[in-house]
Amino acid sequence: MSIEVVKPGLSTTVQDLGRPGYYHLGIPLSGALDQYSCRLANLLVGNDESAAVLECTLLAPELAFTDNAIIAVAGAQATPRINGKDVESNASLAVKAGDTLGFDLMKAGARTYIAVAGGIDVPMVLGSRSTYALGAIGGLHGRKLAAGDRLPVGNPGREARAGRTVDIGLVSSMAKELALRVLPGLYFHRLTESSADTFFADTWTVASEADRIGYRYRRGRALHFLERQQPFGAGSDPSNIVDAGYPYGSIQVPGGLEPIVLLRDAVSGGGYAMIGAVISADMDCIAQMQPNNKARFLLVDMPLALSARAERQQRLVRLRAALAG
C-alpha cells in the first residue's frame, strides 16, 4: 500500500515519537512536536502510539490513496475533506482506493497529524522513522515531502476500523493565548533584577521564525544581563557563555532581545545563556502556536512541574482507556 503526495503543503514530514539517546552526539530528539496529538491519531486507527505519522505545518497536504485505508486526523483545527467533502477530525475514517484527502486552512493550531493504519513505513534510522531535516536523516529521504512522493504504508493491525471517536474532553484545545510555565535555568541569575521581572510580566508574540528548531518570541521588553568580564571562550555580548548543552525546551535570548524556546530539532549545545526551560507538560502547546499568537511566561518550581507532568500522564492513561480495543 502507498500514498501519493499530490500537494505537499507548506512543510509536511514523517514523524513518530522521536529518537532519544543520541543528544550527546549532537543528534536531537526529533519526533512529533505535539506528542499528544500524534498519539491520539495513532490510537484512533489502532496503531501503536509510536507509529510514524505525517506532521503537517500551517498548510496541510493533498494526498491520493492507491488502496483502501483507515486514517485519522488530529491536532490543529483544519477540516479534512475526502474527495472535497468535509469529514470529521479526531475520528477514524475509511478511505477507498482512488480517494483524495485534502484540508481547509488551519483556523487554530499550527500542526495537524495524519495517521494511517499500519503506519508510514519508511526505514528506521537510529531507532526512529522521524525526519531530522537539518541532518538529512529519517523520514522520506531525510526531507519534507514533495509533490510526486510515494509513502509506503505498513500492514494494518487487527484494531484498525472506521468509526472510532474520542470525547471532546480528550482533544487538545488550540488556544491563541497561552501561559507557558517555566523553570529558571542555570543562567537565570545573569539577568538583571528588573529584566527577570519584565520577562515574566510581558506578553510575547510568536514571530514568523517559528519552526521545528525553535520558537522565537518578540514584542516584549529587551532583557539585560549583568555586566561581567567575559571568560575565555565566551562571546563579547553579556548573553554569551562558554559553550554548554541546551536542554529540550530551554530558553535563550541572543543579545537580550527575543527569547527563543528550543524544540525537538534544535542543536544540542552552544554559546547562549539558558535563562530557563518550558516544562515538559507545556511543550505540546508551543507546537500548536501560530505566528502572532500570544504567550506569557509563568515562573514555577520543580514540584509544580512534576505535578503537571503527572497530570499529563494521567490524561494519556484516560485517552488509552477510552480508545482501548
Model region roles, listed by residue range:
Residues M1-G325:
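Conserved "landmark" site that anchors the functional core of diverse proteins
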